[in-house]
Swiss-Prot record:
It comes from Solanum lycopersicum (Tomato). Residues 1-12 have a biased composition (Basic and acidic residues). This is Eukaryotic translation initiation factor 5A-1. CDD domains: S1_eIF5A (cd04468). The modification Hypusine is found at K52. Residues 1-23 are annotated as: Disordered. Keywords: Hypusine, Initiation factor, Protein biosynthesis.
Length: 159
């Protein structure tokens, strides 16, 4: 090996799987699940007893974590379901561009410029108003299955 230092830009997933398997019977309310290829937060779980033919079934009612749409799925409790890797990261807001993208400061001092303003009206108003007032804002970004979206805001005081 040489004494050269090797620097590389680390990507969040680095080729890792976007989901992991978990037995349907062990997924609880408040957990996450993939339904119709969408990452969802479970809001209701009900289990039916085993019938004459087959397994106990789990009925999941879940909300898509990015669109807010309600999705349902029924899975035998002994089968595996895909569970998304969901991450929340806080970034400091630096700028809002004319075309609706935000410029965020990462932990290592780089900028992240590939996120749009939130689609939620109240969150959008909080971000725009806070930025216009010159407040120091920290935005929470949720990421799962290759998608990212601004999901929260914190005011850390005036600039």
């Amino acid at each position: 090996m040489s004494d050269e230092e090797h620097h590389f830009e680390s990507k969040a997933d680095a080729g890792a799987s976007k989901t992991y398997p978990q037995q349907a019977g062990t997924i609880r309310k408040g957990g996450h699940i993939v339904i119709k290829n969408r990452p969802c937060k479970v809001v209701e779980v009900s289990t039916s007893k085993t019938g004459k033919h087959g397994h106990a079934k789990c009925h999941f009612v879940a909300i898509d974590i990015f669109t807010g749409k309600k999705l349902e799925d029924i899975v035998p409790s002994s089968h595996n379901c895909d569970v998304p890797h969901v991450n929340r990261t806080d970034y400091q807001l630096i700028d809002i561009s004319e075309d609706g993208f935000v410029s965020l400061l990462t932990e290592n001092g780089n900028t992240k410029d590939d996120l749009r303003l939130p689609t939620d009206d109240t969150l959008l108003a909080q971000v725009k108003d806070g930025f216009a007032e010159g407040k120091d804002l920290v935005l929470s970004v949720m990421s799962a299955m290759g998608e990212e979206q601004i999901c929260g805001i914190k005011d850390i005081g005036p600039k």
